[in-house]
């Protein structure tokens, strides 16, 4: 009897973990965008007017819980919780709920960045949060939850990143470290997440997951409610979970400890794609991209060119400030069949702490758009760049196809097909790519969705004529604006 019960428990746990890898996308949509620091009602409008029509699958939103108010309002204040009240500079609970409903209604899922590892760091005296709640972080007193000192790990600093105890029980950059093995802490975290599920979210990005023991997270995840069927989710659907685990290889706390609980952020993807498109690696090596590079299995990897953290760091990672290689890397990311894709939508920054665009009263301002739909007034909105949203459409058009017809010049000119539905070519050399290449597409004329759009049957950019054998003449000049060309069956002239 014990053996039967134990086996049943293992089967149920395994089923739950597999379910937590499902992002619950509509139809053939399969790309998430991180609308970093956007306000809730602005996201609702963006879902309806841009994201749904362009085929985006979901939005990662900034933390929703009340946070500390820091001088100058740096972006990272959102990662310093005071309580689990749903009031931030992005809006209140009513506005959040409206956003979730409106986005779900047009098939765009919402994933919340959640902070389960910690509360706010030290603050001189009494701290006040964005909902007006007071706390004394130095005393580990957070009455808005409530938490007191007994709910936290003892104070210590992470000085040795090879020491598991320090990584998981000491304070990450001084943030008060919650004890997730405590029944009380677990109950408050589950209550917080369940409330978001009730409001209709599809899942969670779990911040700083490697700083929490995987067995504690497994308990919390398995205790969550199923997704809300009133928002269009099937019965017994589990929340999609993707966990921030920074693992460059040979880490004491490994990504592999978390991958069965949900998807895991594949930071090596971000670093290596940056290396390649900065010219530090020949593009020909990308033929074995993905698990061939030692990355996580595709269905367990949350992939990205940059995120809100590493785009602010020096190193190989690309960001909007290097637009040509960034667009090329994004095109490859969305064309190659590996991982659960997320694209970044940023605001302009001059230093690590730059706040989102705000007015004189430190209120976040809404993005504004020019005649071409691009963002102005301090918002970058990479997701509105044609070269990015067009590749979201490409990824939708070629879903469930494999790589075929790989070609390279032995260096950094490459092309490949996605079945008979799509074709991508990239030129990262200092000389032109001019070649008859196999596009694998049916005969006809196709619009290059990178350089233009198909409007009323006409292409506003380059077009490529494909012959009866699937070949077309491909030209990408070394000084071309984008360095990439993309064709697919939904862009046939």
From Swiss-Prot:
The record's listing under SMART domains reads: Aamy, Aamy_C
Q: What is the top EC class of this enzyme, as a single word?
A: hydrolase
Cofactors, names only: Ca(2+); chloride
Q: How is the cofactor bound?
A: Binds 1 Ca(2+) ion per subunit.
Q: Which GO terms describe its cellular component?
A: extracellular region
Which residues make up the binding site for chloride? 205, 307, 342
Instruction: Kindly state which reaction or reactions the protein catalyses.
Output: Endohydrolysis of (1->4)-alpha-D-glucosidic linkages in polysaccharides containing three or more (1->4)-alpha-linked D-glucose units
MF terms from GO for this chain are: 4-alpha-glucanotransferase activity; alpha-amylase activity; metal ion binding
Family indicated by similarity: Belongs to the glycosyl hydrolase 13 family.
Record GO biological process: carbohydrate metabolic process
Cellular location of this protein? Secreted
> Site: Transition state stabilizer. Where?
309
UniProt keyword terms in alphabetical order: Calcium, Carbohydrate metabolism, Chloride, Disulfide bond, Glycosidase, Hydrolase, Metal-binding, Pyrrolidone carboxylic acid, Secreted, Signal
Per UniProt, where does Ca(2+) bind? 117, 168, 177, 211
Organism, by scientific name, is Drosophila erecta
Q: Which InterPro entries match?
A: A-amylase/branching_C (IPR006048), A-amylase_C (IPR031319), Alpha_amylase (IPR006046), Glyco_hydro_13_cat_dom (IPR006047), Glyco_hydro_b (IPR013780), Glycoside_hydrolase_SF (IPR017853)
Q: What is its EC number?
A: 3.2.1.1
What does UniProt list as catalytic? 207, 244
Task: Give the protein name, as stated in the record.
Answer: Alpha-amylase-related protein
